[in-house]
């Protein structure tokens, strides 16, 4: 089936699909405070979703393209779930968030099909994959249209990988007690086996969102990157997130000695946001299999256990947490009780001495990850490094921070 036909089959013009903002039915905790964060973007009045311009631009999307799509959403006069929120248009039609971003992705998909230069075609496919992922954002469970956009993103990503430098292999990993999961192993030029970074992504992202990290930081140093989706989304959608948050990644780690392209004696874990919860758990539970762990903006304790911190977090992010935990109808109080169990300090891990070297990068006044969480990580490690990343200029400092983290990983891994 061609890409165009697949798009037409998946996105039939129906209007009974549930609208994203209605999927998690929590009791709202009142007026929202403005929130801005380097990794998560910022709350903007009249939008349900956080607008994550930095990460979208970092992944290769032109700022003007973001504004163009937003403008189409704003200008729509179609029926909305909440008339005060632009991105709540009901049904797959003009003005709907998923429709507009997927439509933009299809433009790049068509460019990719028409382009004769393999490298340029690969770039266009990657661009389309990124736009489809934004269409599916924030990847809530039960969002049928978002899941269709994710399927198109994965297909476009596979097309891109065939044309871009290096090699990518799609790999299946067996997990006892449930469905197997699929990951992508990205390998630089040269002969393996390669030192490898196991990516532990955020809860509002897909594994295909991290190609820029591999291409700009790991590949030039001869380091491979292995990604899997977090529990409950993408290729890991049949697995619910539990207090054993590192379960899937642990089984992947255990399988690496049987992967000929990976040097299983030189493996690092890198965690973004809640992915740091996974990475730090691995540092404690799988220290013989891991050389180092790096974290960025970690969610390991405060946000999970501090009611005041949770009150400052946008509704969308709390919806993401509730969705991942399978608590679509829970009260905020029930959600708070459950989240507390995910704190690595409450679990009795953080605070104990850990033999694995751990780095943690943070931004001051980050509403999702205070400095204390990063200090807790690095002070628990026998070889810890704390990295403060200045907020402004945000893009330049984000890049500089990633370069420093990669330097640190390379020094201990290679």
From Swiss-Prot:
Coiled coil: none annotated. Disulfide bonds: none annotated. Its EC number is 3.1.1.1. Gene3D superfamilies: alpha/beta hydrolase. It is an enzyme of class 3 (hydrolase). It holds the Pfam family FrsA-like. The keyword Hydrolase applies. It catalyses: a carboxylic ester + H2O = an alcohol + a carboxylate + H(+). GO terms for molecular function: carboxylesterase activity. Keywords: Hydrolase, Serine esterase. The keyword Hydrolase applies. PANTHER family: DIENELACTONE HYDROLASE DOMAIN-CONTAINING PROTEIN-RELATED, ESTERASE FRSA. HAMAP family: FrsA. Belongs to the FrsA family. Catalyzes the hydrolysis of esters. This is Esterase FrsA. The lineage of its organism: Bacteria, Pseudomonadati, Pseudomonadota, Gammaproteobacteria, Enterobacterales.
